[in-house]
Amino acid sequence: ITTLASYYRATLNHGNDIISLESELNIVRDYVKIALIRNPNIVKLNYDIDDSLLNLQIPKMTIQTLVENSIKYGIKAIDQPISITIKVRKLITHAEIIVEDDGIGMSTDTIDRVMKGERLEAKSGFGLKSVLNRIALINDNMSLKDIMEIQSEPNSYTRIIMRLKYK
């Protein structure tokens, strides 16, 4: 219950649409703890974070949405866990956030549709389109291809690379 309360407090905190990377990672940890209640062995979460970027300001629910998508769409089979790695690197002009999973991957057609901002299913909610729009706003409306890159191999992996300018 404590984890659920913490998650809802963080996600429903209106007025704080931009939060620190550290706060976003806490939201991700809470989300995964909640997801593990249904199936305790379904997700293995790994981190490779440059600690000097923990105060980096990012749109709330950015990484969480990508992790949620990995769990929702990437799991190969009911009893086969998915490994998700979150990497945050400091580059010269920007930070790079990478969320990678070893799930079912995406076809080239699906990647193209995502990059065009198309909804992939009728019930999809927050999703990648929202993440892209929010990152574009804080990145001086950079082009989609400058903000995000998707690499994927069907039945192998998906890697999403996001670039955020330093503010």
Residue ranges and their predicted role:
Residues 1-149, 161-163:
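Two-component histidine phosphotransfer core
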Residues 157-167:
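Short C-terminal beta-strand
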